[in-house]
Amino acid sequence: MNDRLCFDTRTATWATDVARTRLSTYRARRDFSRTAEPAGDQPITASGAELRFVVQKHAAARLHYDLRLELDGVFRSWAVTRGPSRDPHDRRLAVEVEDHPLAYGDFEGSIAQGQYGGGTVQLWDRGTWQADGMDPAQALATGDLKFTLHGERLHGSWVLVRMKRDRTTSRRADWLLIKHRDGEAREGDADALLADGGSVASGRSMADIAAGRGHIPIPWRRG
């Protein structure tokens, strides 16, 4: 079993300290008196559960889909410019962005215009994920993370590959998100899955969320 999935209270305290350090960029970019986004100042609780993932549809300056994978007490995050595709022939650009707090996995709403990332955010998919083979932190460091998603919309094996021009630098980088060929792949599917536009947490459309209409999103529960 991946030792990142089971950790004691002492390790949880360490993870909280690491997460707070890694969230410094996230916090510096936001005025929490003007945005409803979580500040990420809650402690990381010990859990034996699988790692969580979320995909958020984000109508900012440009519409994109934010892929977030839980790792070491934060969400490692990528802005997938055209959204995920189940067609293995499609290589979707995924721009690495700052780490986000785990509480962001339940965020759905509007970010005020003028704030960083201003626009509407919808919980488009969520579930659990697992790395295939190599330790996920090591895989990310080498620029080749193979993983399996168990979501409400996305399933099966995927890979995030850091583009070669960005492999020798420590800066945030451009990656490619690619679906592996398996039983969940859909060749020729392209953007068909993206047409399914309701929130997995509230059922709301982007327009409903922007207008503040409809049900409050249901928080995700492990297990």
What feature does the model see in each segment?
Residues 2-223:
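A charge-rich, low-complexity, intrinsically flexible signal that marks solvent-exposed coils, linkers
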